[in-house]
Amino acid sequence: MASFPSLDNDRLLRTARGEPTDCTPVWMMRQAGRYLPEYQAIRKEHSFFEVVETPELAAEVTIQPVERFSLDAAILFCDIMVVPEAMGLTVKMVSGQGPTFPKPLTTPDEMERLVEPDVESALGHVFEALTVTRHELAGRVPLIGFSGAPWTLMAYMVEGGGSKSYRAARRWLYRHPDASKALLQRTTDVIVEYLIRQVDAGAQMLQVFDSWAGLHTPENFRTFCLPYLAEIATRVKAAHPDVPLVIFAKGAHYALDALADTDYDVISLDSTMDPDAARDTVGDRAVLQGNLDPCALYAPPDVLRREVQHMLAGFGPHHHIGNLGHGMLPDHDPEHARVFVDAVHEHSRHMRTV
């Protein structure tokens, strides 16, 4: 592993390990990106995937919110679709639609189009971006790496793009359960190597995004999500036992107890999950992250501060990482993001004194 500057602010990592801190650490999913004018200026000159695939540009965009706000982490500017790309599928970023696959996997026979990638070669730009970013951060805050989860990536690979129901992908689970498991396992193997290499390249915490976990029945989650999520955590921890792992299984309320029994250190909650109930279920088995409604950032600052106080009261002063229940939205006012970040720090400090 490369040599990096020492870390000045380790509040996030200490919280993820269950250690006490002076206040609640905070970062925001999609904190780097479309709502920031400085990002928009870069996008006028470069396409989305050009930014992702150019380490210096990815590093610049990753650091932009750290320069602007008092965040406790940077998260690499990248995209979960780099894994399906590495496996041989073509991904296009279409304005107004997001990622699309011109040739999705419509039948199990089409899995023959997939390749077993040389992860180091196929995703080398990601690893280089992590290394460049880690050096440019100069120890200000830790750097988070991430990947999409096997089911969420499969949903896109089969559906061909975004969908409200992902019925084509879910149809696979019922019509082709064995092929679905084979696809999930192949994707899992790539993700594991990808995440391990991210740590080697400079990532100090890792998050797995299972954005469409909540589309499953509890039984299908246990069959088509949980085993692969658990395997990822176990295998990555075997390689890097000291690196905190976060799981974000959006919408899977019923899965909290099972996820708490895996090797993930942190469970990220979406905005529909009740922090008190989650704490009762999880106990001290995992730290919780989240979960302010992103739309609360549209509120006037005084209302937003009250929403933050309410969120923090639900989680309590310890074993909590402040975040949103999903990502920043393109039309968010950056100054309201500042209010959110500062309010988490200020009110959580106050909570520790009473």
From Swiss-Prot:
The keyword Lyase belongs to this UniProt entry's keyword annotation: yes
Reactions that this protein is recorded to catalyse: uroporphyrinogen III + 4 H(+) = coproporphyrinogen III + 4 CO2
Residues at which substrate binds: R30, Q31, A32, G33, R34, F49, D79, Y156, S211, H326
EC identifiers of the protein: 4.1.1.37
Enzyme class (EC, first level): lyase
InterPro entries: UROD/MetE-like_sf, Uroporphyrinogen_deCO2ase_HemE, Uroporphyrinogen_deCOase
GO terms under cellular component: cytosol
Pathway: Porphyrin-containing compound metabolism; protoporphyrin-IX biosynthesis; coproporphyrinogen-III from 5-aminolevulinate: step 4/4
Site positions for Transition state stabilizer: D79
Subcellular compartments: Cytoplasm
Gene Ontology biological process: protoporphyrinogen IX biosynthetic process
PROSITE patterns for the chain: UROD_1 (PS00906), UROD_2 (PS00907)
Alphabetical UniProt keywords: Cytoplasm, Decarboxylase, Lyase, Porphyrin biosynthesis
Chief place where the protein resides: cytoplasm
Pfam families from the UniProt entry: URO-D
Molecular-function GO term, any one: uroporphyrinogen decarboxylase activity
Stated role: Catalyzes the decarboxylation of four acetate groups of uroporphyrinogen-III to yield coproporphyrinogen-III.
Protein family membership: Belongs to the uroporphyrinogen decarboxylase family.
PANTHER family cross-referenced by the UniProt entry: METHYLTETRAHYDROFOLATE:HOMOCYSTEINE METHYLTRANSFERASE RELATED, UROPORPHYRINOGEN DECARBOXYLASE
Binding partners and assembly: Homodimer.
Protein name, per record: Uroporphyrinogen decarboxylase
Species of provenance: Salinibacter ruber (strain DSM 13855 / M31)
